[in-house]
Amino acid sequence: MMIEDDTGFVLHARAYRETSLLVEVLSAQHGRVGLLARGVSTAKGQVLRAALQPLQWIRFSAQQRGELAQLRGAEALDAAPRLVGQAMLAGFYLSELTLRLAPRQDPLPELYLAYGEARARLAVGAGLAWTLRRFERELLTALGLGFELDSASDGQPIDPAARYELDPQEGAQRLLSERGGERRAAATGSALLALAADEEPAAADLASLRLPMRRVLAHHLGPRGLKSWEMLEQLAPRR
């Protein structure tokens, strides 16, 4: 199958043999695509190599053969965001999460748009925590793994003053215990309603979403977590 003039975001690239790269791209028309880019380490291939850096938005053509597609050509469509510090780790997180959960060769236009929007927010220095929570919500929805955020699993409307655990399969479940550990790991009702309405909540409510959303994602990721979680963990108080 030929892939002609598709656009995509580079999620990951690593060296393969002496002059090639193995590249993972989230594309607009074909979903996640694995590419073999030959000759990028030669003098003539430097421009192509530069276009295949993580977070780069590209237009590309390839010949699909089995799991990997042979890259025929690619060009950068903009300047990749120059991210540093926390924003750089957040960009790594977006890409790693997409790489782990999005299946290959399954078009996911909503996820493509969500990734592009999150990338744009990182580029302009938008709030990291809200950018990540919005992307997590959109990713789960695009993969068919999302759930209602404005009503609990028992059908009752979310109470802004209550706290809720997020069950990966059932959705929001009202917390009945006020024990400190359980309370800290639960999202506020206000935060869930804000996430449902796509309106950034107050800082304390926003912070309450991190652990419940991670629990949901961890369920779908399986026993192997994310490398980016290990790095982001130390930044949690500031996110």
From Swiss-Prot:
Keywords: DNA damage, DNA recombination, DNA repair. It comes from the Bacteria. One of its GO terms (cellular component) is bacterial nucleoid. The keyword DNA damage applies. GO terms for biological process: DNA recombination; double-strand break repair. The keyword DNA damage applies. Belongs to the RecO family. Involved in DNA repair and RecF pathway recombination. This is DNA repair protein RecO. It comes from Stenotrophomonas maltophilia (strain K279a).
